[in-house]
Amino acid sequence: MVDYLITPTTKDDLQYVLHLFEEAIKLQNKNGYKVWNSIDQKKVKQDIENGLQYKIVIGKDIVCIFSIQYNDPFIWHNLDKNDAVYLHRIVVNQNYKGQKQFEKVLNWTVAHTIQQNRQFIRMDTWADNNHLIDYYKSFGFRFIKYYQTTDAKELPIQN
């Protein structure tokens, strides 16, 4: 088993984090997946500054990044009752694709959710991204409902 570390990203990681997003967008476009069109750099910077974006590091390589939130009222409305950790913007370094990075993210998030005294882990994705929905279901997530977000300025592009 390869040793890895999950730790908050720092402002020194910003350029590489943006590169990972750009590479993910290229791959999504190549494979025909509807997810992100561009990067909300302001939100990425906010997540880093607020300690809400994390990285998985193996050796000196950042192999995956993800963000968390403790509230997400724009997506979850009345279900947002301060009882969940919301997992967002998961990006895997393409050199480490297929090496179970999401499993590491999920294991960390389960422990963090318990540590934060919360009951649920919640995620969202595009409603027509059946491939990703099925992938998350394979880890025990349940589909809750379809919801179309507004163009609220509080929502990042990648939400």
Protein language model regions, located:
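A short beta-loop-alpha structural element at the N-terminal edge
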Residues: 4-19
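A short helix-loop-beta-strand connector motif used in the catalytic cores of GNAT acetyltransferases and
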Residues: 45-55, 86
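Conserved GNAT-fold acetyl-CoA-binding loop/helix
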Residues: 22-45
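Conserved acetyl-CoA-binding loop-helix of GNAT-fold acetyltransferases
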Residues: 92, 98-111, 137-138
